[in-house]
């Protein structure tokens, strides 16, 4: 298997300026097969008819369904669409990627994080931006250095991770251990995540497989 065989779907706002689209764009540039789903051209994202999305067909045969937690703050329709996509995607065998970022209104992070917690058993890769790592650490009252491991243990998420651009460091807590690894060059956090999920399906198992994906 190669990156060109990796299939993923991302859901986000029609402006295409959110984290889900960014991951899709990075992955597309690496050769993955990507599709971005949003509302119709003449619809408002906050209240579009999310029932028009055929999630069963859209997620059939894909590796990853990508969502960003702050999407649910855009309105009831996006929130319902994220939930429906995760439910149907899980039934179709897709694995869920969830990005946690500090929203534009930072006080809303408790809402977006609450949604993540409510769906945490459906998530396969949970990624925190560095800003979100600090914010959730304060919200959960868990030291930042322990946060990824604590969340993985609580939620049984297979991969809980972050990337620190200044240190060129990827940190992954996974079901078989922990990995902290320095990449060859400094990457943007979402650029690293795109590389990680593009390489993870064929990088092998255990710590070595995770390390290989981290450096992909």
Positions of PLM-derived features:
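Ribokinase/PfkB-type carbohydrate-kinase core domain
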Residues: 1-216
